[in-house]
Amino acid sequence: MSSTLDTQHDVVVEKQPARTAPPPMYQVVLLNDDYTPMEFVVKVLQKFFGKNSEDATRIMLQVHHEGRAVCGVYPRDLAATRIAQVSQYARARQHPLQCIMEPT
């Protein structure tokens, strides 16, 4: 913390360090469809969400059985980027895989 002296009015002003709140977080949710192969979903989870084979398989099975699963939790911009990357990657390979983001 630093102090400055205003010599004209003899006032000491103490500067407080700025406190910023953490950004709101969003979960990226992978949605089930009837066409995207399970192996492709596992690959997407590994490539874009950094999941190991075991975690990627577990999440893929949750998507398959429950219709959806959380892939990760990120600040809004990063969540939106992950969704765009997955969508572009899936479309380029002719798969209808979809992700959405939801506030935590």
Swiss-Prot record:
Transmembrane segments: none annotated. It holds the Pfam family ClpS. InterPro entries: ClpS (IPR022935), ClpS_core (IPR003769), Ribosomal_bL12_C/ClpS-like (IPR014719). GO terms for biological process: protein catabolic process; proteolysis. SUPFAM superfamilies: ClpS-like. Gene3D superfamilies: 3.30.1390.10. Belongs to the ClpS family. Involved in the modulation of the specificity of the ClpAP-mediated ATP-dependent protein degradation. NCBIfam families: PRK00033.1-5. HAMAP family: ClpS. Binds to the N-terminal domain of the chaperone ClpA. This is ATP-dependent Clp protease adapter protein ClpS.
